[in-house]
Amino acid sequence: MSISTQITFFEFLTPLVASGQKTITIRDKSESHYVPGTRVEVFTLETQRKVCEIDILAVEPLKFDEINEFHAEQEAIELPKLKALIQEIYPNIDELYVITYQLAK
């Protein structure tokens, strides 16, 4: 397993990442290979435009049913919308990971 040095976000989320307002992302196992203490480059998913850099703070397992208001607040989206988005991106996947990060200074 190699250490990931880049991460992509939907373009509509990148202003929240770049402002430091969005501090977590929920991904499946295939996108969970980030290492706390490393810096990664943030790109838009749609256009591969570099947005900023973030420092990975933690990578922790998370079951779909455990997604709650805290995660929604950190993701800057309402809980029902967050759950719907996660199900759309990762259909029928219960084993997820929450990646906590901060904007690189």
Curated annotation (Swiss-Prot):
The protein's enzyme class: hydrolase
UniProt signal peptide: none
Xref: SUPFAM superfamilies: PUA domain-like (SSF88697)
Enzyme Commission designation: 3.5.1.135
Catalytic activity: N(4)-acetylcytidine + H2O = cytidine + acetate + H(+); N(4)-acetyl-2'-deoxycytidine + H2O = 2'-deoxycytidine + acetate + H(+); N(4)-acetylcytosine + H2O = cytosine + acetate + H(+)
A Gene Ontology molecular function term of the record: N4-acetylcytidine amidohydrolase activity
CDD domains, per the entry: ASCH_yqfb_like
Segments forming domain ASCH: 8-93
Pfam family, one: ASCH
SMART domains in the cross-refs: ASCH
Catalytic-site annotation from UniProt: 22 (proton acceptor), 25 (nucleophile), 75 (proton donor)
Keywords annotated in UniProt: Hydrolase
A GO cellular component entry from the record: cytosol
Organism domain of life: Bacteria
Family affiliation: Belongs to the N(4)-acetylcytidine amidohydrolase family.
Function as written in the Swiss-Prot or TrEMBL entry: Catalyzes the hydrolysis of N(4)-acetylcytidine (ac4C).
PANTHER family referenced in this protein's UniProt entry, alphabetically: UCP029143 FAMILY PROTEIN (PTHR38088:SF2)
Protein's recorded name: N(4)-acetylcytidine amidohydrolase
Organism the protein comes from: Vibrio cholerae serotype O1 (strain ATCC 39315 / El Tor Inaba N16961)
Taxonomic classification: Bacteria, Pseudomonadati, Pseudomonadota, Gammaproteobacteria, Vibrionales
